[in-house]
Curated annotation (Swiss-Prot):
Assembly mode: Monomer.
CDD domains for the chain: GluRS_core
Motif segment ('HIGH' region): 27-37
Annotated protein name in UniProt: Glutamate--tRNA ligase
Organism listed in the record: Arthrobacter sp. (strain FB24)
Catalytic activity: tRNA(Glu) + L-glutamate + ATP = L-glutamyl-tRNA(Glu) + AMP + diphosphate
Family: Belongs to the class-I aminoacyl-tRNA synthetase family. Glutamate--tRNA ligase type 1 subfamily.
GO biological process assignments: glutamyl-tRNA aminoacylation
Family matches, as InterPro entries: aa-tRNA-synth_I_cd-bd, aa-tRNA-synth_I_codon-bd_sub2, aa_tRNA-synth_I_cd-bd_sf, Glu-tRNA-ligase_bac/mito, Glu-tRNA-synth_I_codon-bd_sub1, Glu/Gln-tRNA-synth, Glu/Gln-tRNA-synth_Ib_cat-dom, GluQ/Sye
Length: 504
């Protein structure tokens, strides 16, 4: 029997600059969305937007033991929260429905039948133990992997295996020559002949593997650019060979262009694990990252707008993003830098927008109810501008302004605030109370003038120490939003009540 060759792709149709860009994001619904996964989605989405192309969102859910609907819903929630939208895919539909692999099994069976008929795939009956035994008998390392033994079984051998009740896996026949492709990020890459054995595409129970369904879906959906993590680089020669075969049998129209994005490293120069708390997208959201800040930072994990420009908008990202500019070197996830960039984007928010984004965090801290009262609305409107310039994460807001929402008798004084109090605390508080009691116009300027006169001028306390006891009495903290403005929000009666309560 003459087996077909898929080694020569020189004359195969290729993606050109004129080919409309079609990229995809195709996660498995396992676990919680993590930084590396979202960076991949972001780069695909940005490239589609930059080129006026199409972003396809499909789900690879052929592993029933690991996949879950909860993870699927989390993927949808993650992309929607970040504002990463898709033209085709789950929930949206499109010309290549369905977009969940578990609903496309009949399509894969048809393709497998064509691959078998054309000789690009074959049945393999060897068990792992038999493969190892053959390696040992030949003096080879038993862990070398599959030895291509079943490539050309006779009809009699196949019949004998079937008589034993064996169910075959299906393997793709790898060419006996180098496999070379050009990576958008890494340039030309070659895998030497013989370095990759014939590989399984269908399990013995008939269920398809990622090695089959991923390139088949790319072919059927007309994907032009495969942009994914570096961890999948080693699987690319297998996919190149399979796509060549798919072109030969009329399933694929062209070979997509591959681009492998750099690893994201965590602490200690180790690859950032999806189980690392810093990698968990929803934990980052819970801490108070906003989409604008997080997208900006994730863009920097392998790409940059310019050498001296770390802060940019999503619109600027779309305008300038090109996969060819992505660096091959590993990118390090620096949580401190991420927080700083997030803080810059918080300061860029419109005041009303910022105020509205604080509400879920205040609600989570039980400072406000499901519906804000008129007084809570008033406090938030006046307090938000005091902290917008001072926080890097929305999650820092509740602790910073919680004292404004509490009853006067519910202020807990932090330990570090107590430690800095002067020995003549009672005297200082009495002077402050007397000075404030006399203030008729309850404004920040009047409050500051009265306290400065009583504590700095009259008592001789250094300015940087003078107002600490008042701050602690009013807020319970050593550090708070601007003191005098906070006292205006509380009102005269509440401010004095807190000073009296703290004095005891």
């Amino acid at each position: 029997m003459t087996t077909p060759s898929v080694s020569n792709a020189v004359s195969s149709p290729a993606v050109t600059a004129e080919t409309p860009v079609r990229v995809r994001f195709c996660p498995s619904p396992t676990g919680t969305p993590h930084v590396g996964l979202i960076r991949t989605a972001l780069f695909n989405w940005a490239y589609a937007r930059h080129t006026q192309g199409t972003f396809v969102f499909r789900i690879e859910d052929t592993d029933a033991a690991r996949d879950s609907e909860e993870s699927y819903e989390q993927l949808l929630e993650a992309l929607k929260w970040l504002g990463i939208s898709w033209e085709e895919g789950v929930e949206t539909g499109g010309p290549h429905e369905p977009y969940r692999q578990s609903q496309r099994l009949d399509l894969y069976k048809d393709v497998v039948a064509k691959l078998l008929e054309a000789g690009y795939a074959y049945e393999c009956y060897s068990s792992p133990e038999e493969v190892e035994a053959r390696h040992r008998a030949a003096g080879r390392d038993p862990k070398l992997g599959y030895d291509n033994f079943d490539r050309n079984l006779s009809a009699e051998q196949v019949a004998a295996f079937k008589a034993e009740g064996r169910e075959p896996v299906l393997r793709v026949r790898m060419p006996d020559e180098d496999v070379t492709f050009t990576d958008m990020v890494r340039g030309e890459i070659t895998f030497k002949a013989g370095s990759i054995p014939d590989y399984v595409i269908v399990r013995a129970d008939g269920s398809p593997l990622y090695t089959l369904v991923n390139p088949v879906d790319d072919a059927l959906m007309g994907i032009t650019h495969v942009l994914r993590g570096e961890d999948l680089l080693s699987s690319t020669p297998r996919q190149v060979v399979l796509i060549r075969a798919l072109m030969e049998i009329g399933v694929a129209s062209y070979m997509p262009v591959f681009g492998h994005l750099p690893y994201v490293m965590g602490e200690g120069n180790k690859k950032l694990s999806k189980r690392d708390p810093q990698s968990n997208l929803f934990l980052l959201r819970d801490r108070g990252f906003i989409p604008e800040g997080l997208l900006n930072y994730l863009s920097l994990l392998g790409w940059s707008l310019s050498a001296d420009e770390d802060i940019f908008t999503v619109e600027q990202l779309i305008e300038h993003f090109d996969v060819h500019d992505v660096l091959a070197n590993p990118a390090r996830f620096d949580i401190k830098k991420a927080e700083a960039i997030n803080g810059t984007h918080i300061r860029m928010l419109d005041a009303d927008d910022f105020r509205g984004r604080l509400v879920p965090y205040l609600r989570a801290a039980n400072l406000v109810g499901e519906t804000l009262t008129a007084r809570e609305e008033e406090i938030l409107t006046e307090a938000a501008p005091l902290i917008q310039e001072r926080i890097a994460l929305l999650g820092e807001a509740p602790e910073m302004i919680s004292f404004l929402f509490k009853n006067d008798d519910a202020i807990d004084v932090a330990d570090d605030a107590r430690k800095g109090l002067p020995e003549n605390l009672t005297e200082v508080l009495d002077a402050a109370i007397a000075a404030l009691d006399a203030v008729a116009d309850w404004s920040a300027e009047s409050i500051q003038t009265a306290l400065k006169q009583a504590l700095v001028e009259d008592m001789g306390i250094k300015p940087r120490l003078a107002f600490g006891p008042v701050r602690t009495a009013v807020s319970g903290r050593r550090i708070s939003p601007p003191l005098f403005e906070s006292m205006v929000i509380l009102g005269k009666a509440s401010s004095l009540a807190r000073l009296h309560a703290f004095r005891g």
